[in-house]
Design a protein with these regions (language model features):
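Core catalytic lobe of class I
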Residues: 1-175
Length: 175
């Protein structure tokens, strides 16, 4: 039987050109409601810090530009972190994950509600060469550090880790 479901996500920026206003869509809240409606227990949320300067350079988001703070800071915003939302089904665990090899100092790092040390660039990047002009543009590789921690925390050696949205295969690569 399964144990936990870990969902990597972020809240979604709303663009004025597409929807007529600038804001955020509570995507993490939508995920939470969907899992609770399906009978899962919301167990935890990890916030993954991302550099707002890198986000501003990559997205040119108006709310992150310094000139916007100087012009009208009511339209400014903070950077958008990633989240890992953890859900589980209630019931007996026939094969508990004991983590006897996890030292206290590493557990304290993993137990932090904000993971500040995830290397945002540590991803599988080979997909870029395979892109075609007609390909979908939503490829978003997950950081390998995040996957490594979640596998360590929530699975035993030899367990099958189900990854329904395999994308470029980062979870399989880390497992």
């Amino acid at each position: 039987s399964g144990r936990n479901v870990c969902v990597h996500c972020m809240d979604l920026p709303i663009q004025k050109g597409k929807e007529g206003f600038i804001g955020l869509r509570d995507f993490s809240g939508m995920i939470l409601r969907a899992f609770e409606d399906a009978g899962f227990i919301y167990a935890s949320r990890i916030t993954i810090w991302k550099d707002p300067v890198v986000e501003m350079q990559r997205t040119k988001a108006l709310g992150l530009l310094h000139k916007q703070v100087k012009k009208d800071s009511t339209m400014s915003r903070v950077g958008i972190p990633d989240y890992v939302m953890i859900f589980r089904k209630d019931g007996e665990r026939n094969n508990p994950v004991t983590n006897t090899d996890l030292p206290v100092d590493l557990w304290q790092k993993y137990a932090s509600p904000v993971w500040m040390d995830i290397d945002y660039g540590n991803t599988l990047q080979g997909f870029r060469n395979g892109r075609d002009d007609n390909d979908e543009k939503h490829i978003c590789p997950l950081q390998l550090d995040t996957i490594e921690r979640l596998i360590h925390l929530y699975s035993n050696k030899g367990d099958t880790v189900f990854t329904p949205f395999m994308g470029i295969g980062s979870e399989v690569f880390q497992a």
